[in-house]
């Protein structure tokens, strides 16, 4: 077999009745790409909840019977480039990004990813992550770990509210998630938001103190609402929040939202990326994300506050912001665990366990 003909292995599924498996196909590197495309040899890909959520919601009658590939985040090296590709992208370049798809035959949990760098954005050149001598992970692992979560957090802060100041206050429900990790770093180091309050378990408070939260409230020691109310009254001068950001799925504050969120006229927002209830990743249904209450909150013209479902696919400019913050050392992608390609099932199980503190990454090389 010619060196230009390779076996491309990918982690795929067909629908919600079929398991995740490794499928193989023959790829001719001389002809598998168009003139405006590049071929990336993937070194690492990160898992995100959207991967197994879309898998479990994939009805064969609606979404077809073709193999669908896992994952969106990636890092790797360009090994082929079409003649019409912008010369910014050259063979040998180390790149990372987010390949956006829902039920695509192409995904990033694969050995070779073919994409159009002018259309399949965001894509960027990898930057070196500041590391100490005991750091166990290489730059490819870190580069794959941040695009989707960082971009989701950035778009939440950038899209909905433009007038952040040192007097602004934000409440984060689910302070320990990877999106919230990015959120607090962006809020404090890029938008210079004055006060960020996080809600997490009592066992996670010490860890999260180091991330930049100004105050932390445990959800497993009494009422969340009452604990936040006490904090607001005792140290925030009873001032309300400019934004409540929910990254886990919660509805506790809705009955008393006017006590915590500033009036709608002041451009305040309640933003969720997880719906109104914490999802059971092993038993997901459309109702977890498209509930009647969510629809009513979105379209009700009489509600007294701005409610939005956060963007799963963020604006392209976030990738450069992330690069700059990484180079400055103001954001370092959090890694929970790293698995080899043939350990993909263990990697998925780890993320589905809800115990991961940081990103779960799969290495191809």
UniProtKB/Swiss-Prot annotation:
One of its GO terms (biological process) is DNA damage response. InterPro entries: ADH-like_N, GroES-like_sf, NAD(P)-bd_dom_sf, YIM1/Zinc_Alcohol_DH_Fams. Transmembrane segments: none annotated. Keywords: Lipid droplet, Mitochondrion. It is found in: Lipid droplet; Mitochondrion. Disruption phenotype: Displays sensitivity to DNA damaging agents. It comes from the Eukaryota. Disulfide bonds: none annotated. One of its GO terms (cellular component) is lipid droplet. Its main location: other. GO terms for molecular function: alcohol dehydrogenase [NAD(P)+] activity. Belongs to the YIM1 family. Present with 6540 molecules/cell in log phase SD medium. This is Protein YIM1. It comes from Saccharomyces cerevisiae (strain ATCC 204508 / S288c). The lineage of its organism: Eukaryota, Fungi, Dikarya, Ascomycota, Saccharomycotina. The gene is YIM1.
């Amino acid at each position: 077999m010619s060196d230009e003909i390779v076996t491309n292995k990918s982690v795929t599924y067909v629908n919600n009745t079929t398991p995740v498996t490794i499928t193989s196909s023959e790829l001719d590197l001389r002809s598998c790409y168009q003139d405006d495309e590049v071929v990336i040899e993937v070194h690492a890909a990160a898992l995100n909840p959207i991967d197994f959520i879309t898998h479990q919601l994939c009805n064969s009658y609606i979404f077809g019977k073709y193999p669908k590939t896992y994952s969106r985040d990636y890092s790797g090296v360009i090994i082929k480039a079409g003649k019409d590709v912008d010369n910014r992208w050259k063979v040998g370049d180390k790149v990372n990004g987010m390949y956006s798809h829902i039920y695509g035959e192409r995904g990033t949990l694969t050995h070779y990813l073919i994409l159009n760098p002018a259309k399949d954005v965001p894509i960027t050149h990898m930057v070196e992550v500041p590391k100490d001598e005991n750091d166990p992970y290489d730059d490819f692992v870190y580069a794959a770990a941040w695009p989707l979560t960082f971009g989701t957090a950035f778009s939440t802060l950038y899209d909905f509210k433009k007038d952040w100041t040192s007097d602004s206050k934000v409440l984060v429900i689910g302070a320990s998630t990877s999106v919230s990790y990015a959120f607090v770093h962006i809020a404090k180091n890029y938008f210079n938001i004055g006060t960020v309050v996080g809600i997490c378990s009592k066992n996670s408070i010490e860890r999260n103190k180091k991330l930049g939260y100004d105050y932390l409230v445990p959800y497993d020691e009494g009422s969340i609402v009452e604990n936040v109310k006490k904090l607001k009254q005792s140290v925030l001068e009873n001032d309300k929040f400019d934004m409540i950001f929910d990254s886990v799925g919660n509805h506790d504050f809705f009955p008393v939202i006017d006590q915590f969120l500033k009036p709608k006229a002041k451009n305040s927002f309640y933003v969720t990326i997880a719906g109104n209830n914490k999802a059971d990743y092993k038993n997901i249904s459309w109702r977890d994300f498209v509930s009647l209450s969510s629809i009513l909150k979105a379209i009700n013209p009489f509600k007294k506050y701005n409610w939005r479902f956060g963007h799963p696919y963020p604006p392209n400019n976030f990738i450069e912001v992330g690069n700059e913050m990484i180079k400055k050392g103001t954001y370092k992608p959090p890694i929970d665990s790293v698995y080899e390609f043939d350990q993909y099932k263990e990697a998925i199980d780890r993320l589905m366990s809800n115990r991961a503190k940081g990103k779960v990454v799969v290495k191809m090389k």
